[in-house]
């Protein structure tokens, strides 16, 4: 018989993995629609590369800021995850309203910085739920990362 706590931890893992898939799907979303964006904004190949690389740069910046200020230790983890996911969505939406290259790059930087709040915080969150099956739980989250980042393609 499964104890209530075990049911809760698997529910938490399932919901967190789903959240990771949905938020991490924005990682390479610009790459999958690069042709349409380059036509809409009249961008060259170099500028499209900047849009793709801006997410990685934003992730590095976001991870440094998050760790420097120990955000996952200061804020309740559920709130931080929710905040990060909302920021990912809003930052990704910005690219729909951009009219120039600078706004598009800022949108992608903000997306990356927001993703840096979501993924590491989710790892910490799930590690607090699992003692015995922590390796399996971490593997599921890494799988969610992989599926999410590949989702746009």
Where are these regions (language model features)?
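Extracytoplasmic
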Residues: 11-45, 62-66
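Helical-face signature of the major facilitator-like transporter fold
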Residues: 16-24, 92, 100-112
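Small-residue-rich transmembrane alpha-helices and their cytosolic helix-loop interfaces
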Residues: 20, 52, 56, 85, ...
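Small-residue-rich segments within alpha-helical transmembrane domains of MFS-like 12-TM solute carriers
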Residues: 24, 28, 112-120, 150
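Residue-level signature of mid-helix packing/kink "hotspots" within the transmembrane helices
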Residues: 28, 55-64, 149-150
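Juxtamembrane helix-start elements in MFS-like secondary transporters
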Residues: 44-52, 77
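Conserved MFS/SLC helix-loop-helix module at the cytosolic interface between two early adjacent transmembrane helices
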Residues: 63-102
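Cytoplasmic helix-loop-helix junction between adjacent transmembrane helices
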Residues: 107-144
